[in-house]
Amino acid sequence: MTVKTRASIAKKIEKDGLDSQYLFMDPNEVLQVQEESKKIPYKMEIVWRNVALFAALHVAAAIGLYELVFHAKWQTAVFSFALYVFSGFGITAGAHRLWSHKSYKATTPMRIFLMLLNNIALQNDIIEWARDHRCHHKWTDTDADPHNTTRGFFFTHMGWLLVRKHPQVKEHGGKLDLSDLFSDPVLVFQRKHYFPLVILFCFILPTIIPVYFWKETAFIAFYVAGTFRYCFTLHATWCINSAAHYFGWKPYDTSVSAVENVFTTVVAVGEGGHNFHHTFPQDYRASEYSLIYNWTRVLIDTAAVLGLVYDRKTIADEFISRQVANHGSEESRKKSIM
């Protein structure tokens, strides 16, 4: 299916009630970006500082993995796993489903909780993360997409963080309306104090807690609960940009690169239903996977029971079925309802 064909499909989707603001791909703008890119001479410029920092991180993570396997106390292993899961929620339930897509609403205490979890993940402040993610959805697989899959698996996975952004990313990202993000005092606070927050939550507390509560050595605590856990969480998130656009099936829209991928659903705490998500980005569930796989939905639903979350947006099953019949694959959909 061509992008031009998707333009007519998009009109049909909007008429059926799917608000496009937060955000599914705008086919007409995709065509425009593709034409503009042909006129822009571009050569990737490596940011060597980032290369050095990520290289150092992976060396530290390798040390952490060794210490985890051979020397760390079991409490440190459990603690590191908990940090990985909850920092993941700071991305999936927070930066992604709440702030990037507005797929549900949360009370101030819940927003503060998710912001604090997001600091453990250290993946840029939420405003910047959401801006890049909205670019990714609105101009998927073009030069305005920060992790454009047409540039290869490594670029999509982490290479995009090692080079300067394409001019189209800067130009079109600057046109997005981010007033909803800048009007949230929780996000403004995080952005203003981001460096001390992430140093405290991503590295200092993960080191101090094991040392204080179960007498782990500071060396092991830092490298296991700090650097290894952080690096593993990064790759789990990056797998959504890479593996979830390359390896899997397409039940809901065969024209997009995003796929359903069970592995990424597991490692990214519920984000692997990516073909569903790119087709219905405002659905807070982000997939049709069962709760066994969609831990982020479990968190959001639990918070709703506690009165911390409300106005969870979903797409009607009849509309999903119609979308599958017209533009997807019913046989593939069966794999996504597990």
From Swiss-Prot:
Keyword field: Fatty acid biosynthesis, Fatty acid metabolism, Lipid biosynthesis, Lipid metabolism, Membrane, Oxidoreductase, Transmembrane, Transmembrane helix
Alphabetized InterPro entries for the sequence: Acyl-CoA_DS (IPR015876)
Membrane topology designation: Multi-pass membrane protein
Principal location class: membrane
Tissue-level expression: Expressed in the intestine in adult worms and in all four larval stages.
Disruption phenotype: RNAi-mediated knockdown causes a significant increase in the abundance of C18:0 fatty acid, as well as a decrease in the levels of C18:1n9 and C18:2n6 fatty acids. Slight reduction in polyunsaturated fatty acids (PUFAs). Widespread vacuole formation, germ line necrosis and shortened life-span.
Induction: Expression is regulated by nhr-80 and nhr-49.
GO biological process terms held by the UniProt record: fatty acid biosynthetic process; intracellular oxygen homeostasis; post-embryonic development; response to hypoxia; unsaturated fatty acid biosynthetic process
EC number(s) from the headed UniProt entry: 1.14.19.-, 1.14.19.1
Single Gene Ontology MF annotation: iron ion binding
Family: Belongs to the fatty acid desaturase type 1 family.
Domain notes: The histidine box domains may contain the active site and/or be involved in metal ion binding.
Protein name: Delta(9)-fatty-acid desaturase fat-7
Protein source organism: Caenorhabditis elegans
